[in-house]
């Protein structure tokens, strides 16, 4: 298994396909597996790079609190290890924030930026959601935290129709949970992030992808991002909730491939 070395945590990564590189960065869970519904479609046209965030999955676990700046450096290390100078960067929620930080720190490495259900700063609603998740984790433990997660991520009908799939995923997530303190550290880092004053400094082509029925990160937060980032565009779907890339992968894949294709022309 390939790893990016050189920092305080070895970072597991995967490469699929060939072509102009696309680096995918997951959200709160941090695992490369979040992007499984994207691999086949994207790898037919691009070199697809996935990785586990530091402290999660198969990456090094022995880390303390990690800033967004450090997470962006991790992202750059993965590109270095893969031998990639620049890539389209797509991040889900927190992964998008990390991509935004890389676009600010090293714009020459980001061909384009796609932020899926992201935000510039956690507002009162989003903070309440994260605080509830923290309390579930602290009061009831990792299993309850994991079992509550679909309620934040997926549409009710999709949950009802995919109970067996969710139960299988939950068993894996509990077995490989990053640890309570690591997850709490990640939540605190994301709540502390405030990128509002630097949005105008983002100079790479940017797409804000959002789901109108996202009950965790409302789509108006993507609208605010689009208003602050020069020449950014927003693409919204009606249904799919926070994890619409998994719920309606064909829709998301077409959206991302179309955007990257325009940039590569």
Swiss-Prot record:
AB hydrolase-1 domain: from which residue to which, for each copy? 21-123
Q: Keywords in alphabetical order, please.
A: Hydrolase
Say if the entry is tagged with keyword Hydrolase: yes
GO molecular function per UniProt: hydrolase activity, acting on carbon-nitrogen (but not peptide) bonds, in linear amides
Per its UniProt record, what SUPFAM superfamilies does this chain match?
Answer: alpha/beta-Hydrolases
Enzyme class name: hydrolase
**Which Pfam family, just one, is annotated for this protein?**
Abhydrolase_1
Q: Does the keyword Methyltransferase apply?
A: no
Known catalytic reactions: carbamate + 2 H(+) = NH4(+) + CO2
Q: What is its EC number?
A: 3.5.1.-
Query: One GO biological process from the UniProt record?
Result: uracil catabolic process
Instruction: Name the domain of life this protein comes from.
Output: Bacteria
What the protein does comes down to: Involved in pyrimidine catabolism. May facilitate the hydrolysis of carbamate, a reaction that can also occur spontaneously.
Q: Which family does it belong to?
A: Belongs to the AB hydrolase superfamily. Hydrolase RutD family.
Q: What is this protein called?
A: Putative carbamate hydrolase RutD
Q: Which organism is it from?
A: Azorhizobium caulinodans (strain ATCC 43989 / DSM 5975 / JCM 20966 / LMG 6465 / NBRC 14845 / NCIMB 13405 / ORS 571)
Give the gene that encodes this protein.
rutD
């Amino acid at each position: 298994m390939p790893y990016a070395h050189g920092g305080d945590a070895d970072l597991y990564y995967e490469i699929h396909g060939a072509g102009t590189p696309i680096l995918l960065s997951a959200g709160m869970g941090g695992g490369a597996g979040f992007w499984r519904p994207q691999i086949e479609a994207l790898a037919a046209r691009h070199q697809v790079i996935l990785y586990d965030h530091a402290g999660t999955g198969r990456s090094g676990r022995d880390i303390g609190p990690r800033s967004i700046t450090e997470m962006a450096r991790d992202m750059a290390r993965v590109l270095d290890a893969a031998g990639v100078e620049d890539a389209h960067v797509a991040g889900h929620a927190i992964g998008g924030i990390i991509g935004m930080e890389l676009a600010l720190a090293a714009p020459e490495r980001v061909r384009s930026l796609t932020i899926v259900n992201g935000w510039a700063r956690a507002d009162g609603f989003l903070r309440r959601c994260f605080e509830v998740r923290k309390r579930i984790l602290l009061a009831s433990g990792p299993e309850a935290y994991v079992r509550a997660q679909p309620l934040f991520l997926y549409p009710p009908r999709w949950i009802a129709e995919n109970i067996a799939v969710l139960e299988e995923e939950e068993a894996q997530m509990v077995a490989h949970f990053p640890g309570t303190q690591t997850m709490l550290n990640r939540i605190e880092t994301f709540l502390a992030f405030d990128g509002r004053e630097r949005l105008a400094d983002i100079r790479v082509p940017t797409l804000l992808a959002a789901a109108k029925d996202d009950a965790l990160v409302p789509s108006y937060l993507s609208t605010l991002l689009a208003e602050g980032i020069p020449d950014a565009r927003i693409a919204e779907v009606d249904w799919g909730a926070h994890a619409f890339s998994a719920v309606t992968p064909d829709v998301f894949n077409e959206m991302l491939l179309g955007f990257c294709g325009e940039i590569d022309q």
